[in-house]
């Protein structure tokens, strides 16, 4: 197993959102998080990524194993597409940005400042950063937002290649990405007692970015 979660309790601010969450993810496997809006998917991903401390339970994985992609793209607007990828590649100690550029068809945009990109182009660049992290576990929160059908397929292909290479992915998404070796986890049964699944304040979008 590359990640094991045991009896995890998660909170958003002072409010407990989830309790008793247990699952494991193996190398080469994708876990798709399901549940209604506000159920706690973002909170769970933030907790797995170490951005929010758990209230209880354990999360076991290798050190620095998780790359987290949040709702916001978190790009450096003044840097070009290539410079953004080079910046993150340097942070994570990797060198080659070419595979990331190729995977998301960013070559025609390589010299364009990120601040001048469309929403879909920004999303492609944000997701391309996953390929320069070198981290085996991808935790992804609604990663296909702003992507058209063609680029959603590109993203799915990138995840599939990551899985074939022995990586793993935990993805909160409402669409079928057609990934092999994917299974679903409905988090609705883990919603903390007394918190309605439809509570709009249970799990608002995270507006920062770990990547």
Curated annotation (Swiss-Prot):
Similarity remark: Belongs to the ABC transporter superfamily. CcmA exporter (TC 3.A.1.107) family.
Main location: membrane
Domain ABC transporter residue range list: 3-211
Organism whose genome encodes this protein: Jannaschia sp. (strain CCS1)
Enzyme class: translocase
EC number(s) stated in the UniProt entry for this protein: 7.6.2.5
Localization terms from the record: Cell inner membrane
GO cellular component: a single term: plasma membrane
Subunit and partners: The complex is composed of two ATP-binding proteins (CcmA) and two transmembrane proteins (CcmB).
Function field: Part of the ABC transporter complex CcmAB involved in the biogenesis of c-type cytochromes; once thought to export heme, this seems not to be the case, but its exact role is uncertain. Responsible for energy coupling to the transport system.
Keywords for the protein's UniProt record, in alphabetical order: ATP-binding, Cell inner membrane, Cell membrane, Cytochrome c-type biogenesis, Membrane, Nucleotide-binding, Translocase, Transport
Residues where ATP binds: 35-42
Pfam families referenced in this protein's UniProt entry, alphabetically: ABC_tran
Record protein name field: Cytochrome c biogenesis ATP-binding export protein CcmA
Reaction it catalyzes: heme b(in) + ATP + H2O = heme b(out) + ADP + phosphate + H(+)
Membrane disposition: Peripheral membrane protein
UniProt keyword Metal-binding present: no
Gene3D superfamilies assigned to the protein according to its UniProt record, in alphabetical order: P-loop containing nucleotide triphosphate hydrolases
GO molecular function: ABC-type heme transporter activity; ATP binding; ATP hydrolysis activity
GO biological process, one term: cytochrome complex assembly
Keyword Transport among UniProt keywords: yes
